[in-house]
């Protein structure tokens, strides 16, 4: 009975801590590196962005962060205050990117103007914020002030945001004390802007000449609060080059594997995550890049991480269906060219 109570307390603890946080992502400072594999001699292609002054392109970026907890049995000993569900946020931002200038290294200064925004936040399945700039009734929401606002960034040919040049006017416009105003301000933070405009699939600029069949990689780490931290090596492989409407489209696919990168720091966080040590863990982390080699623009990039933990009562009262908690974390990012 004592062990059942401990399991119940663990379930309640998970809900209080895990679900009230969306987790965070820490991109490693190490740039993507190309791994050259033996193969037939072919002409390599340059996997890089190209920028032209005055050129304007519209993109849609979607990020999704979700944590969920589900009680996996009908065990009558389930804590009375247990309430599973999903906690997280999904953000969809449509913006124009107008190139203002370029330099001899291939970097560009780009003016970003927000055109549309959708923002959905949940806590244990309860919607805490739901905004859609296309809905007339949302016109008075402080988040609507973001529409039409601009900021300026420097972007490298390898798809990295090297500098946030100016976002002062946009930040001043959305300033306020309400929850929606603070959310709007957060969407203009350096961290969120960097994530929004970074193309994580491209190799480093000095290793961007790639043959079909070759691979390159980068490291990305995630913190899952009470479930600890994990690092992954994202391995990209250039699968093929297609001719589409007079354009050459490079297609690369990503498969990620657990990495020992930053092992010491990750071990400290993992050691404190006692719930993770009680669970079985499964995970999938995949992605796909479509890069227009002719125009030097990303057609589409998507990546999705899904990781699950299953904690089973080691001494179940009902041997045929032991009490269990299933916790799932989803982290996804996508960018697609609209026009």
Spans of features found by a protein language model:
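Signature of exported/secreted
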Residues: 25-339
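Bacterial N-terminal signal peptides that target proteins for export
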Residues: 1-13
């Amino acid at each position: 009975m004592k062990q059942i109570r401990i399991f119940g307390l663990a379930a309640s603890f998970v809900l209080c801590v895990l679900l009230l946080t969306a987790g965070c992502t820490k991109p490693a400072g190490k740039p993507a590196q190309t791994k050259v594999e033996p193969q037939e001699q072919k002409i390599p292609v340059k996997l890089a962005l190209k920028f032209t002054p005055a050129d304007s392109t519209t993109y849609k970026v979607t990020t999704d962060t979700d944590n969920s907890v589900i009680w996996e049995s009908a065990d009558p000993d389930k804590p009375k205050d247990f309430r599973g569900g999903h906690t997280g946020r999904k953000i969809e931002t449509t913006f124009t990117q107008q190139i203002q200038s370029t330099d001899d290294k291939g970097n560009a200064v780009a003016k970003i103007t927000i055109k549309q925004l959708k923002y959905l936040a949940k806590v244990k399945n309860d919607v805490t914020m739901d905004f859609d700039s296309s809905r007339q009734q949302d016109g008075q929401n402080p988040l609507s002030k973001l529409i039409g606002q601009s900021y300026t960034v420097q972007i490298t040919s390898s798809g990295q945001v090297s500098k946030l040049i100016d976002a002062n006017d946009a930040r001043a416009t959305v300033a306020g004390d309400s929850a929606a105003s603070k959310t709007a301000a957060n969407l203009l933070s350096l961290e969120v802007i960097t994530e929004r405009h970074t193309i994580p699939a491209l190799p480093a600029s000095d290793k961007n000449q790639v043959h079909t069949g070759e691979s390159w990689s980068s490291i990305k780490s995630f913190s899952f609060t009470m479930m600890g931290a994990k690092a992954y090596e994202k391995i990209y492989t250039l699968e093929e080059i297609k001719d589409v409407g007079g354009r050459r489209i490079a297609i690369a696919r990503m498969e990620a594997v657990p990495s020992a990168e930053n092992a010491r720091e990750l071990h400290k966080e993992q050691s404190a995550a006692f719930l993770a040590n009680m669970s079985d863990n499964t995970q999938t982390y995949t992605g796909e890049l479509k890069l227009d080699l002719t125009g030097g623009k990303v057609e589409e990039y998507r990546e999705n991480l899904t990781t699950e933990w299953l904690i089973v009562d080691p001494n179940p009262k009902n041997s045929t269906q032991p009490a269990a908690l299933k916790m799932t974390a989803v982290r996804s990012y996508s960018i697609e060219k609209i026009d």
